[in-house]
Curated annotation (Swiss-Prot):
Species whose genome carries this gene: Escherichia coli (strain SMS-3-5 / SECEC)
Domain of life, per lineage: Bacteria
GO MF entries: ATP binding; ATP hydrolysis activity
Gene: ravA
Reaction(s) this enzyme catalyzes, per UniProt: ATP + H2O = ADP + phosphate + H(+)
Protein name, per record: Regulatory ATPase RavA
Length: 498
């Protein structure tokens, strides 16, 4: 085969040629091209007049000498109009029931069927066999059909629990299209003088029959790594738990995996990558409700698990917690010891802060975490002036729990060793301590763990950078994944600076 990167570049240029003169249809063209290159079917949902038929017509030009067939279904459509008329000569002379298929669906590489759900049972049954087995029964003979891409279109979804569901399940890729939205694109579309039916693809980019057949075998050789399978299984398990999730047949999952293999192959890779799984958003939905649900679940998968984002954050949380434990273990050494003032005749003992404590805001660590005001608290932030007044005059004292929110009323006291002790509602106490000196830096154990975590983050980010060069994935999805990885990296760096 050609060098993988050269093949990826060629397919990218082929797609760009097919997209010329079509506005806001790049994603649809690219997925239809991927379907054509892997022998799959596409369903286009949308109102009339939004270039659904033109998309299918364009795909004919992706192949050298490809034949196309298109037909607008009605309730009165007959099999003869789709599969060819009966041969009167064969019936008369030889008594054979045979169709003349030249120029009809059985001899076309690219097929477009508009208003597909209006087709009658006779057409649907034959069409199912054509899609499933790439075969057509013509009289007593079974003939192979060359169909590489079937594009079916409608402005509505099939009725639930109807005889149409079997055909709908065969439409692997499902795209919901709308009118041109962008103002500049709308203007360009109105003023374009390009003949939409002209061939925009140079011969050098068109796919030959030999290449197409060879690629079908090579697509099947693309591997599915264990970690990618685990992501797919995680998605499947999650969908099974959701009451409103669409039913996804085993057949659809299997066909979807081949589409992912094709995406990897035409992106120059030898294995399916997590980024390819984004294509499942156009394969697993059934209706408008499930479309949104599937996109949400895949978004969670991509931004939380595909590059171990959530796993790295969990590890980071454990490291931070361990760091706090180490700090708390040192709290006896760094416990804040207040100074007892003279006051023999005073009714209340008075104290003051040590002279070396000069910050206007003090963050004091709890020797052991306490639950205060329904929050697990590991440190409290005080205003120095408020703490000094309390030490001197008593009364109410407030502090911010874990340094966040509004200052909360606290049960604070000075014990016999002149340490500050905070108590919860059950009067369990925890000594307050000064944080370790910043000059001490991170403990070696914590520093090593953070360095290992940062190294793993860099590996995951590098993997994503290598894999994101995928023609078939929209850029906004790649942007969200990049943002999720950058957020993890920022949290790791912040922990390293503590």
């Amino acid at each position: 085969m050609a060098h993988p990167h050269l093949l990826a570049e060629r397919i990218s240029r082929l797609s760009s040629s097919l997209e010329k003169g079509l506005y806001e249809r790049s994603h649809a063209i690219r997925l239809c091209l991927l379907a054509a290159l892997s022998g799959e079917s596409v369903f286009l949902l949308g109102p009339p007049g939004i270039a659904k038929s033109l998309i299918a017509r364009r795909l004919k030009f992706a192949f050298q000498n490809a034949r196309a067939f298109e037909y607008l279904m009605t309730r009165f459509s007959t099999p003869e109009e789709v599969f060819g008329p009966l041969s009167i000569q064969a019936l008369k002379d030889e008594g054979r029931y045979e169709r003349l298929t030249s120029g009809y669906l059985p001899e076309a590489e690219i097929v477009f069927l508009d208003e597909i759900w209006k087709a009658g049972p006779a057409i649907l049954n034959t069409l199912l066999t054509a899609i499933n087995e790439r075969q057509f029964r013509n009289g007593a003979h079974i003939e192979k059909i060359p169909m590489r891409l079937l594009v079916a279109a409608s402005n509505e979804l099939p009725e639930a629990d109807s005889s149409l569901e079997a055909l709908y399940d065969r439409m692997l890729i499902r795209l919901w299209l709308d009118k041109v939205q962008d103002k500049a694109n709308f203007r360009s579309m109105l003023t374009s003088q390009q003949d939409e039916n002209d061939n925009p693809v140079p011969t050098s980019l068109q796919v030959t029959d030999e290449e197409y057949e060879r690629w079908q075998k090579e697509i099947g050789e693309i591997t599915l790594p264990d970690h990618v399978f685990e992501l797919i299984f995680m998605l499947r398990q999650q969908l099974d738990k959701l009451p409103d999730a669409p039913y996804v047949s085993d057949r659809r999952w299997k066909k979807a995996i081949r589409l992912l293999q094709a995406s990897a192959f035409f992106s120059g890779r030898s294995a399916v990558a997590p980024v390819d799984l984004i294509l499942l958003k156009d394969c697993l939905w059934y209706d408008a409700q499930s479309l949104n649900l599937i996109q949400q679940q895949i978004d969670v998968l991509m931004t939380g698990h595909a590059w171990q984002q959530q796993g790295m954050l969990t590890r980071l949380g454990a490291i931070v917690q361990r760091h706090l434990q180490l700090q708390q273990q040192q709290s006896d050494k760094t416990a804040l010891t207040v100074i007892r003032l003279g006051g023999i005749f005073s009714r209340r003992q008075q104290y003051q802060l040590p002279v070396n404590v000069t910050a206007s805001t003090l963050t004091l660590l709890l020797q052991k975490p306490l639950k205060l005001h329904d929050m697990e608290v590991v440190h409290i932030t005080f205003e120095r002036s408020a703490l000094e007044q309390w030490l001197s005059k008593g009364g109410e004292i407030r502090g911010k729990l874990n340094g966040i929110g509004f200052a909360q009323k606290l049960n604070l006291e000075v014990d016999s060793t002149q340490h500050l002790v905070v108590r919860d509602v059950s009067l369990q106490g925890s000594t307050l301590a000064l944080p370790g000196s910043s000059a001490e830096g991170l403990p070696g154990e914590i520093k090593q763990q953070l360095e290992e975590l940062e190294s793993d983050w860099r590996k995951q980010h590098a993997l994503f950078s290598e894999q994101q060069k995928c023609l078939f994935i929209p850029g906004d999805w790649l942007g969200r994944i990049e943002a999720s990885l950058q957020d993890v990296g920022a949290q790791i760096r912040q922990a390293q600076q503590c």
